[in-house]
Amino acid sequence: MLEADNLECVRGERRLFAGLDFKLEGGELLNLQGRNGAGKTSLLRMLIGLLPPEAGEIRWKGKSIKTQGDDFRADLCYLGHLNAIKEELTPLENLLAAAHLADEELSEDDAIDALEQVGLAGREDLACKYLSQGQKRRVALARLVKEKRPLWILDEPFVALDVAAVDWLAGIISGHLQRGGMAVMTTHQQVNIPAGTVRELRLG
């Protein structure tokens, strides 16, 4: 279970939100809504431990994330609004490098299969600098195909995707929820997640 208890966020001299509470269990997705500047990305950064809250506490499996360190990170998959890929590397090299840095096992065959699922068959060995923005986004999203960690934090995952890719990603997220995983995401798009319980939290 992921719990937020009485969270407060202050950036500069501006309070973005205060008294924020929620609980998220397996099979649930929390969709963060709100205008630009309402604190959605700041909340995601809090949930992954990069930004300490001004007040309140975040708990994972009943314990504060501040005390869990690597144990919490081992359960967490974070996908930011930036693609976080190396332009000089190929899609295949990017996937294998990301798995290595996360201390995860990912075979070359599984990485190629993931890239095929995101529509990059035949581009596995092309340097990412030659890909379109939508294709680069798909390289980043390919991580989710084989991802087994229970908690996904997704910042605008549908950016730069066409309609078919949006439907594909919604299916990947749905499968994660069906397996008992949970997710928190921000998106400006209307997306149908066919499985799991989708809850909405509006900021601002």
UniProtKB/Swiss-Prot annotation:
Keywords of this entry: ATP-binding, Cell inner membrane, Cell membrane, Cytochrome c-type biogenesis, Membrane, Nucleotide-binding, Translocase, Transport
Catalysed reactions listed for this entry: heme b(in) + ATP + H2O = heme b(out) + ADP + phosphate + H(+)
Protein role: Part of the ABC transporter complex CcmAB involved in the biogenesis of c-type cytochromes; once thought to export heme, this seems not to be the case, but its exact role is uncertain. Responsible for energy coupling to the transport system.
Localization: Cell inner membrane
Stored NCBIfam families: ccmA, PRK13538.1
Top-level EC class: translocase
Family that this chain belongs to: Belongs to the ABC transporter superfamily. CcmA exporter (TC 3.A.1.107) family.
Binding sites annotated in the UniProt record for ATP: 34-41
S-adenosyl-L-methionine is among the record's keywords: no
Molecular function in Gene Ontology: ABC-type heme transporter activity; ATP binding; ATP hydrolysis activity
Protein name as catalogued: Cytochrome c biogenesis ATP-binding export protein CcmA
GO CC annotations, alphabetized: plasma membrane
GO BP annotations listed: cytochrome complex assembly
Complex and partners: The complex is composed of two ATP-binding proteins (CcmA) and two transmembrane proteins (CcmB).
